[in-house]
Every structure is written in structure tokens, then in C-alpha cells.
Amino acid sequence: VMGRDAGYIALWCGLANGAEQVLIPEKYDFDEQKIVNNIIANRKRGKRHYIIINAEGIGHSTSLARRIEAATGMETRATILGHMQRGGSPTCKDRVYASTMGAYAVDLLCEGKSNRVVGFSHGEFKDFDINEALGMNKGVSDYMIKVAKDMSK
């Protein structure tokens, strides 16, 4: 999934989809042999799938899938979502946020302000200088990482 420098999207995808492994740049503790061992152990317990969410900053999913297939002898597929992950139908929340952020941006322009980015932070809509916004990174929560690991067992 997208996430060259940040694993926020990967972590949320992993939690939402019950992934067994989430690989993110912020907490890179990647041990390929451990993953292979877990896949084999899960298969022996009757589990028929093992989902790994890989943030793009970690490396190539396709080559990882090939190495896992070679090590386990099990059919393995890599799915590169790319821009497809942006293409879902908007939720009610998406539509409300888009309308509110669009109105906020128009208000800024009417006030003579430009080079601003509108976002949602800490429960409210805010605007930021464009250069400041480009330097921001949405961090991941250590607790969410723990939950993802606990849920994958």
C-alpha cells in the first residue's frame, strides 16, 4: 500500500482486514524467516491464508511474495493496490469532510489567503502553510501497532 515514509495507511489496512503481518517503516522489525515460520505454523493449524500488508517504503512486495513461495512451497500472490486504494466509494464522513474542507478553502481565498492547505487535526478543521503541510507526517500509534500484533495471533 502507499506509504513510502509512513506506515499509517498500512497499519489501518492491517487492522481493518485482520492481516497477520504489517510491515511499516516506523517500526521495521522485519524478519523474513520468522514470517515464513509463522506461515508454515498457521498452515499446520489449518489456516488457509496469511495476509501481509506492506507499506511501499519497506520494499518490493512482489519479490517478497516470490521468496515466501519458494520457502514455503505455497502459492503466494502480491497485490499492488497503487491508486486503486483511493478509488472506493466515498462514505458519508468522506463527503462531509470534503464539503467542509472545500468551503474552508473558499473562505480562505475570500480572505485573501493563499498557499494554504486545509486539513482535519485533533478534532477540528484547520489550515496550514503549504510548506509546513508538506513537511508533516502522520505518525503511527505504538498502541495500534500492539493491537495489530495481538489481533494477528
Model-identified regions with their sequence ranges:
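Accessory alpha-helical/coil subdomains and C-terminal extensions
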Residues: 1-75, 81
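Short glycine- and Lys/Arg-enriched binding-loop motifs that mark or flank ligand-binding interfaces
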Residues: 3, 78, 84, 98, ...
